[in-house]
Every structure is written in C-alpha cells, then in structure tokens.
Amino acid sequence: MRLCLWLLFLVVVTARPLRAQGDRCADCHIANPQADPVPEHTYDWEASAHGRNVVGCEKCHDGDATTFESFLAHRGILTSRNPASPTHRTNLPQTCGKCHIGPFVEFQKSRHYQLLRESRGEGPTCSTCHGAVAARLLSPRSLEKRCDTCHGPDGVHPNSDFAPDGRILLQEVNAVRELLATAPRLIGRVKDPVRKKALEDAYEQAQVPLREAVHSAHAFVFDQMRERLKAAKERSEALLIELANP
C-alpha cells in the first residue's frame, strides 16, 4: 500500500504543470523575504503579466530555476550594475527583445537607443517607461509626465510637442483596443460558420495595424504611428458595423 502511494506521489509530482515547476525562484524568494534585499521586486513580478504568463526570473537574470539549492540557483547571476549582466541598463533591450521582438527592432532605430549605447547605460532603456519587472503599461498622463522628464522645459532635450503627442497617441491606442475588446464575444455568438470565419479574419486584420502602431511607438516615429492607428481604427469600426448588422 505504501509503495502504491509513493508511486502515485511520484506521478503527481512529475506531472505537475510547467507553471508550478517554473516558479521555484519566486517560491523561494517569497517564502524567505528576510533574505531578499528587494522583496518588492518579486511581489511586482508575481502580479505582472510576466508572472501570470510564467515568464520566470531565469529568463532575464539567468540562473537555474529547476533547483531550490541556493548556490546552484544563483550560479551565473550577475548584479544589474555589472555591464555583463543581461539586466544591466545597456543590455535590457536585448534581454527584453528575446520575447518582444517587434518593439526591440523598432527601438534600435530610435535616438533613445543610440543615447543608451553612447552613454553606456545612462540613456533611456526599457525600464525607463515600463518599470523593472512589473512590465507595466503607463497611463497616457503618466507617459506624458515621464516624457516631460527629458523633453519638458527643464529637460535635457526640450520639445514642447513630444510629451503631449505621446499622451494623445497612447489615448488613441487605448481607444482602438477598447473598440476591439468587444468583438470576440460578439463573434462568438455568430452561428453561420462561413460568416463567423470572415469576422474572425476581419478581427485579425484590425489587430495587425494596431500591433504595428505599438511597435512603431518604440522608434518614436509618431507620423508612422498615426498612420497605422488610423488604419486600425477604420478596420475596427468596419468590423463592429458588420457585427451590428447580422
């Protein structure tokens, strides 16, 4: 009987989902906050899109997420102050770009990226706008204030239009996202398979210029972003009109 229970335990453990197995870094840091110099770092990760989608600590920090042995888990990890660390400010775009390919490609075209490379980490990087681990999306007003840090009247590169333009464009991105957010539920109610497929295709086609607009935002080429947002809005509105007229 004991042997059967032990075998059952092994089956359950080895069959644990990847989410449970991939959280060992966070499990240990959350369980031992007194040993963590910045426990809020782990809490922010857990509540973030990264945490919800099981993008574990090792994806950015390296290390071994398969063990609870502290020495082995932290082997190879470098402090973010080390220029060789994947979380050093200069290296963050490449680290984030392993998953966020589109934004990384566009960011490399920007003056921000040039400044980051030229200044050896003193220029703006991913965490400047998105935070360290929370991967947050700033509100339009928060984005305007962040842009004003450098581009306001007292900033290192004053530009009276840059910050308000960024706020307005992010508001437009959010507006298009809200339009599209209603579509999947309505499409799901369509009974005719042919019409449903056509609507699903139209939904995907509306998403394309929206993604392109968000990507181009990372190059800070606002004219291109406006053009892509215009296309996304037109396609989204056409889709919703079609859904309203069965």
Where are these regions (language model features)?
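Positively charged n-region of N-terminal signal peptides that target proteins for export
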Residues: 1-4
